[in-house]
């Protein structure tokens, strides 16, 4: 069983101050980092951030959720403070699913819930289909849980992803880290993420940059920007979705991701119909793609209500989990 280590840290939100422990877990290429809130025996909830974000995306939401639950929010590899994947490796989507499997094995969680934002919600969807016996409930924050691709685009994207990766590797010795002032780093982050408030940008930057001589550099691996090389089409997506046994809520922002990012014609309707067939819950809230970070009060109560055990007698000890040593 892999050990993991935690150190105490604090953060401040507009609503309250709450202690978080720093999560550290060894993996073959380095370590996974993240944050932990709540008692080790608490009801387990895994929090998965979106692409190019980090576990800080949950820093304002978790303090509004039950304080006797156990929340573990990880930085995916190549994000936040986690190690980058080894040289020459791709950031292919299934690897993120495997990362989750590593984490819950180390935590000794046999059954748990997931809150996933954007890409993290897609990871949650795939994990829940592959390991339906492990996942009790899933909250999908501004995502449909799956991102199918047109068959005609799959191989074009694969070719581009392979070529870009090889080109990146060939230029590795020529590449230098760009150093920013804090304000310039914040400006760059907000240009890439126009939904973020000033406070939200500062929160993400706690784990998104590190200080060096002369300023700050971004911690994330540039390779996360390269094309994914593994996709599923709509028919595969709907089949995989049908394997999910967890209780699912799609918590969508009125001015969220799908106002600017559109799926191919008819895909969203087909995915939503499949979720409806699975008896998923749909909730729309006022806000943008990062509403859970910018305005957590808009989503905290509905998340708490949804994740509450279905039976008052259902406790963490009945889930089959061992009390985590991590």
From Swiss-Prot:
List, alphabetically, the SUPFAM superfamilies matched: alpha/beta-Hydrolases
Q: Name one GO molecular function term.
A: hydrolase activity
Q: Does the keyword Hydrolase apply?
A: yes
- Top EC class, one word: hydrolase
Q: Which residues form the AB hydrolase-1 domain?
A: 44-155
Say yes or no: keyword Nucleus present.
no
Q: What is its EC number?
A: 3.1.-.-
One Pfam family hit? Abhydrolase_1
- Name the InterPro entries for this protein: AB_hydrolase_1, AB_hydrolase_fold, AB_hydrolase_sf
Q: Where is the signal peptide?
A: none
Q: Which UniProt keywords apply?
A: Hydrolase
Which residues carry out catalysis? 118
The family note in this entry says:
Belongs to the AB hydrolase superfamily.
Q: What does this protein do?
A: Probable serine hydrolase.
> PANTHER family, from UniProt?
MONOACYLGLYCEROL LIPASE (PTHR43798), SERINE HYDROLASE-LIKE PROTEIN DDB_G0286239 (PTHR43798:SF14)
* Name assigned to this protein: Serine hydrolase-like protein
């Amino acid at each position: 069983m892999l050990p993991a280590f935690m150190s105490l840290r604090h953060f401040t939100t507009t609503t309250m101050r709450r202690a978080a422990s720093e999560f550290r877990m060894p993996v073959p290429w380095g370590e996974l980092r993240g944050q932990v809130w709540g008692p080790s025996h608490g009801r387990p909830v895994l929090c998965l951030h979106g692409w190019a974000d980090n576990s800080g995306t949950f820093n304002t939401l978790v303090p509004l959720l039950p304080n006797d639950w156990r929340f573990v929010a990880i930085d995916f590899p190549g994000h936040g403070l986690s190690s980058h994947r080894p040289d020459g490796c791709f950031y292919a989507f299934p690897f993120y699913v495997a990362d989750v499997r590593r984490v819950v094995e180390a935590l000794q969680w046999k059954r748990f819930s997931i809150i996933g934002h954007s890409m993290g919600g897609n990871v949650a969807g795939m994990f829940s289909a592959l390991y339906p016996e492990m996942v009790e409930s899933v909250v999908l924050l501004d995502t449909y849980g799956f991102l199918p691709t047109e068959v005609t685009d799959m191989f074009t994207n694969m070719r581009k992803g392979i070529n870009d990766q090889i080109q990146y590797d060939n230029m590795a010795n020529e590449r230098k880290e760009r150093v920013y002032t804090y304000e310039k780093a914040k400006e760059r982050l907000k240009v890439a993420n126009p939904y973020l408030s000033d406070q939200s940008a500062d929160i993400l930057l706690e784990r998104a940059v590190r200080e060096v001589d002369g300023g700050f550099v971004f911690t994330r691996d540039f390779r996360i920007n390269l094309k994914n090389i593994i996709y599923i089409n709509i028919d595969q997506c709907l089949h995989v979705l049908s394997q999910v046994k967890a209780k699912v809520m799609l918590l969508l922002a009125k001015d969220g991701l799908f106002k600017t990012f559109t799926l191919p014609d008819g895909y969203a309707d087909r995915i939503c119909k499949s979720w409806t067939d699975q008896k998923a819950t749909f909730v729309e809230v006022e806000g943008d793609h990062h509403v859970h970070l910018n305005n957590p009060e808009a989503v905290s109560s509905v998340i708490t209500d949804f994740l509450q055990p279905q039976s008052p007698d259902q406790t963490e000890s009945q889930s089959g989990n061992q009390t985590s040593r991590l």
